[in-house]
Design a protein with these regions (language model features):
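Oxidoreductase and adenylate-handling cofactor-binding alpha/beta cores
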Residues: 599-600
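Substrate-binding/catalytic cleft of secreted carbohydrate-active enzymes
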Residues: 204, 330-333, 340-586, 590-594, ...
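Secreted/periplasmic carbohydrate-active enzymes, especially glycoside hydrolases
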Residues: 1-345, 355, 360-363, 393, ...
Length: 684
């Protein structure tokens, strides 16, 4: 009886969602199918087995894996009802999934509609011929089990499973702009030549025409941010692919954080005077290049690219994120002052790209062809299933995200191991396929740059992409010298290809601390004091700031995240190299180091504020600030004033704590405004 009641709830919710949305007068209707779902393990195959009610997005691993090195990679069945109203007759119906992790088999009224392999790109299936008026059954069989024909086959992150991104029902006329062409918008704004004087573009539209008729035409309109029409074109439709060249005079360029200016491009399909369909895309016009000696240039001006690698992973949610999660991450990205982000190691959800467009954050985004880093095996297999899936996911990524101006770099792979006669075994040679993937990117989109992230000798991969980037990690104590020597050598041996930093960093637990005075000491394995992460980043950044030839610098990583293979720091199953904690509630010391260097807003921050209990009276006080100087007080006693150094750091050495509480206070001024920070350390 309980199961029957739940099924009735599914029907009622489905009727409410579909009916209310379909009342809209727009030619295309999109209905969010977030509520009314239930799921169960496929192994629970009893006819009336109860479903666990859920709301999308959802993953079955959101809570289970916390603090462990185990999580479930299995198959689940998601179900809900779809109510088809009389008004939907003679319409076309599509199911649009933004992401199902990783394999999805879709059934409507128990008939197979289609399958999709790949957990991080959208897919769209037409269900017009599978439904009838009234109640319809929708089932999605979802598996995150390991398969060699689904990328990734390895990686230092969890494959969560589930319908972990939103799902929609799209309703159109018989003739429409295609939603099934690689689940893309069906509208692609190609930037043929962009300058400050004019923007020459070609708008390519892919149509789906069930009834080819005379009088079909496509109207394309480009409007600026104020809604003013700046270009338009009308073309008679003679087939399912339409190309329309347009020119904008004196365009306002999308210029990163300085001016993330967006235009809207609307494509309308008409039959005579009757509007059949409309798709609107926001985009921005810009041009860019990377120089092996001078770094990256946006619209002809040098732009220092720095930021983080980011995974889609939030405590208690896994990869099933909501809008507030993207908003929170962007708030932190803006606070620290990043100019770019690397979206690791797979295509991310649409809200992240949209937010980066709007906030001027440049993006590297990539397909999930990734190796295991320092763990066993590699990330590439020379077999038909693997390679076909890589090509498919690449096409989906490019077509789905084509119009985002924030995307400047297409990523090919991350840490693919290769036989080097020394450390690595004789794996399948990935180089021929890497070159093929690079060529496919260039065929689909010659306007952007391609890049790879390697942890093995770059000479194996030179010529496989436009840009070289390294994932490189050095020790706590000498990261500046090691980074300087390594990247100078990488530059000198890159055959004049631009070299960048795709990953660097160190782990940190906010619950583990050690005095920086003992940084030469050997730390216990897995012990990740917050202070040492910050010191390590200081050295890296001091080296990188002196090397403008590096086309980008990406920290690993934005936030702590789940990785089932990890046993380090204070929690098993966590990669703790983040600048913020897994729940985004605590910004680590390293976050404030970069804020002091990247964000021009005046700030002052005392490090080791969570190192509250000391057993050694001798210590130091480390401060990050972009103020010219600051004054230190301990228990209101003035210790002294110092000026910041070139990486916006002040260190007071030889500080002696008194038994009991020691209130640490620093003060500094910017103009007439005084900035203060305090914390309390107790000597026991």
């Amino acid at each position: 009886m309980k199961h029957n009641l739940f099924a009735l709830c599914l029907v009622a919710i489905g009727m409410l969602c579909n009916t209310s949305a379909f009342g809209d007068n727009h030619p295309r209707t999109s209905v969010l199918l977030d509520k009314g779902w239930g799921y169960k393990p496929l192994t629970d195959n009893k006819k009336n087995a109860p479903l666990i009610p859920v709301t999308l997005p959802h993953t079955w691993n959101a809570d289970y894996v916390e603090g462990t090195t185990h999580y479930n990679r299995e198959m689940m069945v998601y179900k809900r009802q779809l109510e088809m109203t009389p008004e939907m007759k003679d319409k076309r119906l599509f199911l649009y999934f933004e992401g199902v992790n990783s394999a999805a088999d879709v059934f409507v009224n128990y008939q197979t509609v289609g399958q999709h392999l790949g957990g991080y790109t959208a897919f769209c299936l037409e269900i017009t011929d599978f439904v009838h008026e009234g109640d319809n059954s929708l089932e999605v069989w979802v598996s995150n089990a390991y398969r060699t024909d689904i990328l990734p086959i390895s990686g230092d992150f969890n494959i969560y499973g589930g319908i972990h991104r939103p799902c929609h029902l799209i309703i159109t006329e018989k003739n429409c702009i295609s939603p099934v062409f690689y689940a893309s918008p069906g509208v692609f704004v190609r930037q043929d030549k962009i300058t400050e004087k004019q923007a020459d573009i070609t708008v390519e539209s892919v149509l789906s025409l069930k009834e080819m008729k005379e009088g079909l035409k496509l109207k394309t309109t480009v409007m600026d941010a104020d809604g003013k029409v700046v270009a338009r074109e009308e073309t008679a439709v003679s087939g399912e692919s339409v190309k329309q060249p347009l020119r904008l005079l004196n365009p306002t360029l999308w210029n990163g954080k300085k001016n993330p200016y967006l235009y809207s491009v609307s494509v309308e399909l008409y039959e005579g005077d009757r509007l059949l369909d409309k798709v609107t895309q926001q985009t921005g016009f810009r041009y860019f290049h990377a120089d092996p000696d001078k770094g990256f240039f946006l619209n002809g001006e040098y732009l220092n690219l720095y930021g983080f690698c980011r995974h889609e992973d939030v405590k208690g949610k896994g990869s099933a994120l909501h809008q507030e999660d993207y908003d929170k991450d962007m708030e932190l990205i803006k606070e620290v002052g990043a100019t770019a982000m690397r979206l690791a190691h797979y295509p991310h959800a649409e809200p992240m790209y949209k937010s980066c467009d709007e906030n001027g954050i440049l993006l590297w985004t990539e397909i999930p062809m990734c190796g295991p880093g320092g763990y066993a095996y590699t990330g590439y297999l020379h077999n038909k299933g693997f390679e076909e899936n890589a090509r498919q996911v690449l096409k989906e990524l490019v077509y789905q995200k084509f119009n985002h101006p924030s995307i400047c770099f297409w990523g090919i792979f991350n840490e693919l191991l290769i036989s080097d006669g020394k450390r690595f075994q004789a794996y399948d040679n990935p180089v021929p396929f890497v070159k093929e993937i690079n060529a496919l990117y260039k065929e689909l989109d010659p306007s952007r740059l391609t890049a790879f992230a390697t942890c093995v000798d770059q000479t194996h991969y030179l010529g496989c992409a436009d840009l070289v980037a390294w994932n490189k990690y050095f020790g706590w104590t000498n990261s500046k010298q090691q980074a300087a020597e390594f990247f100078d050598h990488a530059r000198s041996t890159s055959n004049n290809q631009p070299v960048g930093v795709s990953e660097y960093g160190a782990g940190a637990s906010i619950h583990q601390h050690a005095s920086p005075l003992n940084k030469e000491a050997q730390l216990p394995k897995g012990f990740h004091p917050e202070e040492y992460q910050a010191i390590c980043h200081e050295g890296y950044w001091e080296a990188f700031a002196e090397r403008p030839y590096l086309w980008a610098k990406f920290i690993w990583q934005f936030s702590d995240m789940q990785s089932s293979i990890r046993k380090e720091g204070d929690t098993d199953g966590i990669n703790d190299k983040g600048a913020v904690t897994y729940d985004r509630k605590v910004k680590k010391d390293a976050f404030y180091f970069y804020k002091a260097n990247w964000n021009p807003e005046p700030m002052l921050y005392i490090c080791s504020r969570r190192f509250t209990e000391h057993t050694d009276a001798q210590t130091l006080v480390r401060v990050y600030t972009n103020l010219n100087e600051a004054t230190l007080y301990i228990n209101d006693k003035k210790i002294g004033k110092q000026k910041k150094d070139k990486v916006n750091r002040i260190v007071w050495d030889n500080i002696t704590l008194l038994p009991g509480e020691n209130v640490i206070r620093v003060e500094g001024k910017s103009g007439k405004k005084t900035f203060t920070d305090t914390c309390t350390w107790t000597l026991k």
